[in-house]
Design a protein with these regions (language model features):
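Active-site mouth of glycoside hydrolases
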Residues: 130-134, 158-164, 181, 317-472, ...
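Beta-sheet entry/capping signal
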Residues: 115, 148, 367-368, 389-391, ...
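Extracellular/lumenal ectodomain signal focusing on beta-strand-rich modules
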Residues: 33, 91, 109, 189-190, ...
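Active-site region of glycoside hydrolase catalytic domains
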Residues: 202, 206, 216-219, 304, ...
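Substrate-binding clefts and catalytic carboxylate motifs of secreted carbohydrate-active enzymes
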Residues: 28-29, 36-44, 183-186, 489-655, ...
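Aromatic, loop-rich ligand-recognition surfaces of beta-strand-rich domains
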Residues: 698-704, 710-827
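N-terminal signal peptide c-region/cleavage motif recognized by signal peptidases
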Residues: 14-15
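Secreted/periplasmic carbohydrate-active enzymes, especially glycoside hydrolases
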Residues: 1-8, 18-368, 372, 590-594, ...
Length: 961
């Protein structure tokens, strides 16, 4: 990235030389007064303009439009008032220029086109939201007066994807954001003034290679341009920090000449760096950054200066059995990330707000963000990713529509500018041509060539976001947690090879907390569910999120909600469980064949009820906490599908550890028969199996041979019936007269058979037994089966074969069973409570905790309603405030002083001054469970400005409140 505002490079530059000075002309700078009005007509008045930003956001800020985030206001706006051209006018004084200096006016981007005039003089025409404009205005500014800057912005027009690209493809609405009136037309990127001499430094570029961890090679390229009509001689000086690598290089330029200067270790031996500080993704090491300060001097005077921040790193790319793998600095990277659709649907995320959002991604232990369809162009986003060790999968502005932009030339120019502007960022790992499609000819070849030439081939160009080594897109709806562990969690309609692989999109609806919900939903629309919810995409407008299924699952898992507050509370448990399982399911198969996963979506652009981790107000949902737990670099996890426990190490260091598993009943009593402990050596970048939690101990059918009358490709085959995996299933052909049988190996005695049905269950069936597999006797029959988990008690039986004989299907499909289990039950043996708890711990040699994990499990698949029978929890809360370095921390200790389990405790700090939540914050945990007498310390860290008077309160509330 190239720092522009008051960049200082002092150490080896000539004494007394000032760095390049830049004067920002954004609307918050105080250096200019902006206003905007329609180019023609009086449909709207002139209002103060937000620059950078879109036209519509300026009118919202001016109060002309009601808050478009609230209720259905976004849909009530008369978009015809904004779907037109607008004129921006800015008034600014002339800054001191100095003799022999040139004053430049720079535009970083206008959406979609813009004509620029200064004091009545046309400077140029901008075409595309990443095309820059660089204008010498030295002789055009008023010497001692005010200057009038005008920008005529042409709106985007219809249709948007992909015809109007380069632009914000989702601006006409998507299934996660409304139509943005004006289609985000406006001055959408930075505007500033700068000063230089006759010679300018243009597009400096730092490239790095890492042959091994102890050595790196740095290459510096920069264009040097002589803007004068005379030849000149000068010196290019620079210093790289840390390391103090200083250099100077003489340069002679003819009049008007522009030349590329290339410096390598041959010209500057120090560019062969010993013991470099490498840039690592989050969880693998520190994202070390260097600065390269450049200045060009003529006659002992600085003509221009630039500071480039870069990271020493080298990406690598491999395909194992056709599956994509990413490497950095020679090490494989297991990718854990999220899709970032837009920063904010009206472009109102700016400056330090990017750092806040990217820091939340780092705190979730993510190491990658996908910049979906290149919808974020602000350099502050990339700066934040560099600082926080978040790699970027960076798309260009094409969706899967089989059509080309109307103006291929403008697209190509903007694509080249994007690469050149952003290539110094170490965070960019992949350039991607098209979302879920291959760019239509000639763009695919053009983009591949652009990356090869302007990025030097240092990073991969990937044509399509969900194929060519990737495992598809989706699905985007919630499933039972075990589904993510079983072969294979594939998107609907996927025609490639089934795999976990590298999935660039998979997600689920994620409902907000109640306190966020009430900020954007009118009270009369709170409950019951209604069409207003669909204005925030909980309905048919976001069908891919399956909100109906999500709503039903909350009720099935936790019972019918009695109102919106109860629904939001229960929804957070679904958010946490499913999103944690999504990442843990992939990690369960790490390198076999899973190589990466990115949720759809990690960053909300609009107050939404689907696809997010934290919400629009930066309140972490249950999804955030589930993902944070799953993605920790050293992790212990349980499989919902087969009850196995694994340890996962995505760091670069091996470790010795002890793994412990304990199971507790609903009352918090330890069930010692399930306790297991194992010492383990865990290699770097691996997942290792530890042991199984055998909740089906005594199951005579486990892993026994199975035969069936038929098997449909809808299922995993007959063997799935006894594999102990609650998410693999047998499915029959679509006929009533179907059967499936288990061979127990010999004649066995038993008293109980358990059948776990998928939705396609039997309405009527028989249970039959046989000693020889030919002659069968009936021991159970039903004509009114309801599906789900059915436990069939029997008088003591003896047989070798057990058969389910279908008589009548309950659906149009065949019969489908997850499991058949066969037991001889001792009436006196203790039974698991309907809901019980699993606690896992991983500790180091000294007993220090490396990872812990907590699950709730039901004896009936997905039925957690027994949690509603827990006695109310009694919690004691103590807290203390400290401050340092512009941050404040509320250290909170929550203790369970009651007799019941305190399940899913949510803790939130509030300001006393206005009763509002203190957001955003970072903390270690939330929605945690405390057994009797246990306590948990949580540190809430946040910006000091969020609590200026130090007056706060902390609320802790368990699910069983």
């Amino acid at each position: 990235m190239i720092k522009r505002i008051f960049a200082l490079c002092l150490s080896l530059l000539a004494a007394g030389v000032s760095a390049q000075e830049c004067i920002p002309l954004d609307s918050r700078s105080g250096h200019i007064r902006w206003e905007v009005r329609p180019s023609e007509g009086d449909a709207l008045p002139a209002v103060p303009a937000i620059v950078p930003g879109c036209v519509f956001a300026s009118y919202v800020a001016a109060g002309v439009e009601a808050d478009p985030n609230f209720g259905d206001n976004a849909y009530r706006t008369d978009k015809s008032r904004y779907d037109r051209n607008f004129r921006y006018t800015g008034l600014f004084p002339t800054p001191p220029v100095g003799e022999g200096r040139t004053l430049w006016l720079r535009f970083e981007g206008v959406n979609r086109k813009g004509t620029v005039r200064l004091n009545g003089h046309q400077l140029g025409h901008l075409d595309g939201f990443m095309q820059p404009g660089d204008y010498d205005i030295t002789r055009l500014v008023a010497p001692d007066g005010e200057n009038r800057l005008e920008v005529e912005v042409e709106w985007v027009g219809y249709p948007v994807p992909n015809f109007r690209s380069p632009t914000y493809i989702s601006s006409a609405g998507w299934d996660w954001m409304p139509y943005a009136p004006g289609l985000l037309s406006g001055i959408t990127d930075d505007v500033y003034l700068s000063l230089s001499g006759d010679v300018r430094l243009v597009e400096p570029w730092v490239r790095t290679k890492v042959p091994d961890r102890e050595h790196a090679k740095v290459e510096l390229l920069t264009d040097v341009e002589n803007r004068s009509d005379k030849a000149c001689e000068g010196v290019l000086r620079g210093e790289i920090r840390p390391g103090g690598i200083a250099f100077s290089h003489p340069v002679r330029l003819e009049a008007g000449e522009r030349r590329t200067i290339r410096l390598t270790e041959r010209e500057v031996p120090g560019l062969a760096v010993e013991h470099p500080q490498l840039w690592w993704p989050n969880g693998m090491g520190d994202p070390a950054l260097y600065t390269c300060c450049l200045a060009f001097e003529t006659d002992g005077r600085q003509s221009d200066a630039r500071t480039v921040t870069f990271g020493i790193r080298e990406y690598g790319y491999e395909w194992h059995d056709g599956i994509f793998r990413l490497k950095i600095n020679g090490e494989p990277v297991y990718v854990k990330g999220g899709n970032w659709g837009m920063s904010e649907w009206l472009l109102r995320c700016r400056g330090e707000e990017y750092d806040t959002r990217v820091a939340l991604h780092r705190h979730m232990h993510f190491n990658m963000i996908r910049n979906w369809i290149g919808s974020t162009t602000d350099e502050e986003f990339y700066d934040a990713c560099d600082r926080h060790g978040i790699m970027v999968w960076d798309d260009f502005w094409l969706n899967s529509h089989p059509n080309l932009p109307h103006d291929l030339g403008a697209f190509q120019q903007n694509a080249v500018e994007k690469i050149k502007r952003l290539r110094n960022h170490p965070s960019i790992a992949v350039w991607c041509g098209d979302n879920e499609g291959v760019p239509q000819a000639p763009l695919d070849d053009w983009l591949r060539g652009d990356v090869a030439h302007y990025d030097g081939g240092d990073r991969l160009y990937q044509s399509i976001s969900n194929a060519q080594g990737l495992s598809g897109s989706g699905p985007w709806a919630n499933f039972h947690p075990g589904w993510y562990f079983a072969a294979y969690p594939m998107p609907y309609g996927y025609k490639g090879r089934p795999a976990w692989g590298f999935r660039t999109e998979i997600g689920t609806a994620v409902f907000t907390t109640f306190e966020s919900f009430r900020k954007f939903m009118p009270e009369e629309s709170w409950w019951p569910r209604n069409d207003m919810w669909d204005k925030h995409f909980f309905g048919k407008s976001a069908a891919n999120a399956a909100p109906d299924k999500y709503f039903e699952t909350v009720a099935e898992n936790y019972g019918e909600a009695d109102g919106i507050e109860d629904f939001c509370r229960k929804a957070q448990l679904l958010n946490l469980e499913v999103n944690k399982a999504m990442y843990e399911g992939w990690q369960h198969h790490m390198w076999d064949d899973a190589t990466g996963i990115m949720t759809w979506m990690s960053q909300p652009a609009y107050p939404s009820l689907v696809w997010q981790t934290y919400d629009y107000y930066l309140d972490p949902t249950g999804a955030y906490w589930g993902i944070r737990k799953a993605c920790e670099p050293v992790h212990i996890q349980w499989s919902h599908a087969d009850n196995s426990v694994k340890a996962v190490n995505t760091t670069r260091e091996p470790l010795e550890a002890t793994a412990t598993a304990r199971v507790y009943d609903l009352d918090g009593r330890l069930l010692p028969q399930f306790t297991q402990q194992l010492r383990v050596s865990l290699a770097a970048n691996t997942a290792r199996s530890l042991f199984d939690l055998n909740f089906s101990e005594g199951n005579l059918a486990r892993n026994r041979p199975v035969k069936a009358s038929s098997s449909s490709p809808d299922g995993a085959g007959a063997g799935a019936l006894t594999d102990g995996n609650d998410s693999s299933r047998w499915a029959s052909e679509y006929n009533d007269d179907q059967w499936i049988e288990v061979d127990l190996g010999e004649r066995r005695a038993f008293t109980e058979v358990v059948l776990r049905w998928e939705d396609a269950h039997a309405a009527a069936y028989k249970l039959q037994l046989s000693d020889d597999g030919r002659t069968w006797r009936d021991v159970y029959e039903t004509q009114d089966a309801q599906g789900g988990e059915q436990t069939i008690p029997l008088p003591l039986q003896q047989a070798r074969y057990v058969r389910m004989l279908g008589l009548r299907r309950a659906t149009q499909w065949g019969y489908s069973l997850y499991e058949m289990e066969v037991y001889r039950r001792d009436a006196k043996a203790p039974k698991l409570s309907p809901v019980h708890f699993i606690r896992l711990e991983l500790t180091d040699r000294d007993g220090r905790l490396l990872s812990d994990n907590f699950y709730w499990r039901a004896t009936r698949r997905g039925d957690y309603t027994a949690l509603n029978t827990l006695a109310p929890a009694k919690l004691q809360v103590r807290s203390q405030l400290t401050a340092a370095g512009g941050r404040k921390v509320i250290r909170t200790t929550v203790r369970n002083v009651g007799r019941s389990v305190a399940f899913a405790v949510h803790v939130q700090p509030y300001r006393r001054s206005d009763g509002e939540r203190i957001l955003p914050y970072v903390a270690d945990d939330n929605y945690f469970t405390l057994l009797q007498g246990e306590s948990r310390q949580i540190d809430f860290e946040f910006d000091a400005s969020l609590l200026p008077d130090d007056r706060y309160t902390v609320r802790a509330e368990a699910y069983n409140r």
